[in-house]
């Protein structure tokens, strides 16, 4: 609980009654306003929260903090129905720091690890929380699948929540007993200053490939957004995938000011020239997962993991390097790695006797689809099937690229609907089809359930069917409505 006057120096503008206002929470949604809350009205990309100030007051908000475009209005107080309205210049940019102060700097009261990159964020965040929990911690996670203590995750609307949601969630996790948290840090979250005030004990870079160009416009802008986690924010340990060209470049740049940057590679021939490093020296893929021999500046060892896919080698090594950087004992890590389990919708394998093997994966970018298909091929002794689509109201440029990848790596391709949102599914399909050299060989089935059913009825034992794009999602967005839909449920229905 915070007093209004403890947050800003505005005593002289308030009478004794308003000086004693006690606030219990910060909120952005006026519909959730109630007594004891500070309603925050920011100028968003789609909605201007200032238009809902009166609704928040009517619902019981005890005070309002709103964004002003005029620097001379900064921290001036006005009143509406005896409720104080505090103007704040460039509020969006400073909201993370305000929420940090309001919730007593929660990121400094536990071990927080941030994960950024195009692919792998969810798997790495989940593995960090899972592994530390196995080692005796109470761990939390925030990201694409949802937020909460590990094993008690609730669905979230964005990969990286609002500045307020992040700080309030961390505070809540601590009150629930958490001492470790892993958070997926999206490029949007970095550009929009949502993680600005966080103290990261470690930050991980996974990789960079085409995604979100509808927002960032260029790959250079996209890369610079990701780099902010390491170059501009409070990040103690920096763990980089140097097999990625951007990661290798950042290693050189960041090492100039921080000699402890950690280089991670899946290549046995990688020659580290940094103080801290970890690399795979031998890999073995089998039906039960992957075995990884590694060498590192902390020592050598063997990891046996149930995770499938070459890119999960990189994910697991990045997790291992992070925990070693944080001081975890290498012996305890190697002794517990077998207890790790896969992540929902991330190369999730479903099988039944005398049926094709099905892999459900979240792959929705060209690079992710290529990785998923190459990984699926390792476990395929027959035909490799690929079912995919592309989301509506998103980057159109990646659609033909994904088609070309599906055609190159799969034996049979079915193009279906993903989340068309408000875009015409037929237009999405036409964009995709331009990427095929022989589109006549491709099956087009808009209804996603029918597409999955067709593949499962056609595929035979020893075939592998990759269902890409939705992963953990249990919904399909058509228009502006979310309908219940789960790839996994459909597979089990027709198995």
UniProtKB/Swiss-Prot annotation:
N6-carboxylysine modification, residue list: 226
PTM statement from Swiss-Prot or TrEMBL: Carboxylation is probably crucial for Mg(2+) binding and, consequently, for the gamma-phosphate positioning of ATP.
Residue span of motif Meso-diaminopimelate recognition motif: 418-421
GO annotation, biological process: cell division; cell wall organization; peptidoglycan biosynthetic process; regulation of cell shape
Pathway as given in its UniProt record: Cell wall biogenesis; peptidoglycan biosynthesis
EC number(s) stated in the UniProt entry for this protein: 6.3.2.13
Enzyme class name: ligase
Chief location of this protein within or outside the cell: cytoplasm
A GO CC term attached to the entry: cytoplasm
Binding site residues for ATP: 117-123
Reactions catalysed, as given in the entry: UDP-N-acetyl-alpha-D-muramoyl-L-alanyl-D-glutamate + meso-2,6-diaminopimelate + ATP = UDP-N-acetyl-alpha-D-muramoyl-L-alanyl-gamma-D-glutamyl-meso-2,6-diaminopimelate + ADP + phosphate + H(+)
Domain of life the protein comes from: Bacteria
Localization per Swiss-Prot or TrEMBL: Cytoplasm
Cofactor(s) this protein cannot do without: Mg(2+)
GO molecular function, one term: ATP binding
Residue numbers binding meso-2,6-diaminopimelate: 394, 418-421, 469, 473
Entries under SUPFAM superfamilies matching the protein: MurD-like peptide ligases, catalytic domain, MurD-like peptide ligases, peptide-binding domain, MurE/MurF N-terminal domain
Pfam families, sorted: Mur_ligase, Mur_ligase_C, Mur_ligase_M
HAMAP family cross-referenced by the UniProt entry: MurE
Full protein name: UDP-N-acetylmuramoyl-L-alanyl-D-glutamate--2,6-diaminopimelate ligase
Organism: Histophilus somni (strain 129Pt) (Haemophilus somnus)
Gene name for this UniProt entry: murE
